[in-house]
Design a protein with these regions (language model features):
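ATP-binding N-lobe of GHMP and related small-molecule kinases
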Residues: 1-86, 100-108
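Glycine-rich, charge-dense phosphate/pyrophosphate-binding loop(s)
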Residues: 14, 201-259
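DPxDG-like acidic metal-binding loop motif
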Residues: 27, 88-112, 133-138, 143
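Active-site rim beta-loop-alpha module in soluble metabolic enzymes
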Residues: 164-224
Length: 259
């Protein structure tokens, strides 16, 4: 018996929406889960991750405990195109797939809110896992242990171009450079930019996107970890074809929005 789960890559933060906003994109990882008589087999990933510390396996275990799935052995096969540690939600694909896989064996794969709660518990924040589960553009709020997510339809004529560099940047390192506090003026700017960005995506208001994607919380700091980040952003800012650009997730991928 097997279950196959396809999960989209996600682009989180979208400039000012740090740990809040995320977007599902048309790049996918596919995971196959097969129940075995014994043992654990993990295929399609680097050998150092093919063990019980594997993120997909840990997520499957969480999901199995939640739904009461009793199994003796498991084979996980990973196939896909989402690059690792590039700011496109590769870890979220693993987490969401593992939980959904376990839920599916109990025919409970449509319990999206429960899947979201478990995925956020593992990931620590909902900005990547929410769009991977609900699709489209999502905004999420965490209050204690409860996650509230809204999936928002955006104009389909927008296209997202990912500038993926040939190097990685871990989320841990990217978070380590963030400030502990934010000046009031910067906080107000980010809130206003987030509101403008979301409204512009919903209504197809091109003129609001370049300003709406601007950020004062994480990009000014993370940009120093990425070769040529600021010159690239300046070039995209001047390009009339580009409606807006931002650092995808923790980086180093830069996402540009065009029609």
């Amino acid at each position: 018996m097997f279950v196959k789960v396809r999960v989209p890559a996600t682009s989180a933060n979208l400039g000012p929406g740090f740990d809040v906003a995320g977007l599902a994109v048309t790049l996918y990882n596919t995971f196959t889960f097969e129940l075995l008589d014994e043992g654990l087999e993990i295929l399609g990933c680097p050998e150092q991750f093919a063990n019980k510390d594997n993120l997909t396996y840990r997520a499957f275990e969480e999901g199995a405990r939640y739904v009461g799935l009793d199994y003796k052995g498991l084979r996980i096969t990973n196939e896909g195109d989402v690059p690792y540690t590039r700011g496109l939600g590769s870890s979220s694909t693993c987490i969401v797939a593992g939980i959904v896989g376990a839920f599916a064996f109990k025919n409970r794969y449509e319990e999206r809110q429960n899947i979201l709660e478990l995925a956020t518990k593992i990931e620590g924040h909902p900005d990547n896992v929410a769009p991977a589960i609900f699709g489209g553009l999502t905004v999420s709020v965490m209050e204690e242990h409860k996650v509230t997510t809204l999936s928002i339809p955006v104009k389909q004529e927008y296209r997202y171009v990912a500038l993926i560099p040939p190097f990685t940047l871990s989320t841990e390192k990217a978070r380590s450079v963030l400030p502990q506090t934010l000046e009031r003026a910067d906080a107000i700017k980010n809130v206003s930019h987030l509101a403008l960005m979301v409204a512009s995506l919903i209504n197809g208001y091109d003129e609001g996107l370049k300003l709406g994607f601007k950020d004062r919380f994480h990009q000014p700091y993370r940009g120093h970890l990425i070769n040529n980040f600021f010159p690239i952003m300046e070039t995209l800012e001047k390009d009339e074809r580009v409606l807006g650009a931002y650092l995808s997730g923790a980086g180093p991928t830069i996402m540009a929005l065009i029609r």
